[in-house]
Amino acid sequence: MDSQEDPGAMRKPGLKPLRSSSFKKQYLILYNFVNAILWLTVLGRVLLLIPLVGLGRVYPGVGRFTKWTQTLAVLEVVHAATGLVRAPISTTAMQVASRLLLVWGIIFQFPFLAKSAGYSSMLIAWSVTEVVRYSYFVFTLSGYSPGLISWLRYNTFYVLYPLGISSECWLIYTTIKPAKEKRQVYAWILQLILLVYIPGSYILFTHMMAQRRKLMRAKQIQKAE
């Protein structure tokens, strides 16, 4: 799912990197670079912790860091709302809100759920997706368009998105019972959220497919020229 409009989709082949950048562009490059590093750290920690200490100890080693890294994504809603980036506010807010629910409303409230494989698979899906996405924006905003990053950006979601969504749904589902014991209304809210996930997931997935088609059309136009 995109949080920013692709700044390099219509760039002419052979165009040299920009020599000067506005404050806006420099800010976005820095923002995306920092987030790429943060999510790379999450990915590295998860991949190290699983074989070293097992799934049950992943959360103590990376949970707090992931929680605040994901919370930083609130800025993406602000970027879209203020026009700093050309991105659909609805889809941006939808993804950010769903992830905040997972890290704050579920795992933070019921940390024992993080011992399941669903938590680790969710983090892997999130972190790989975000490392690729933020790296892609760093390059394109800087005037580059690496083929490998572009390919990963618009193809890996076919695998990572279903993995992430299924992991999220599993965690939400397994939270309903302990949430009911804590507060009935919370369990009802989670059940409602699961129902929303069905159309919501479809919207986000088709949005990403539309972004991919847009890029493919742009490349065809460039080749024709």
Task: Tell me the role of every PLM-derived stretch.
Residues 2-51, 55, 63-225:
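Eukaryotic polytopic
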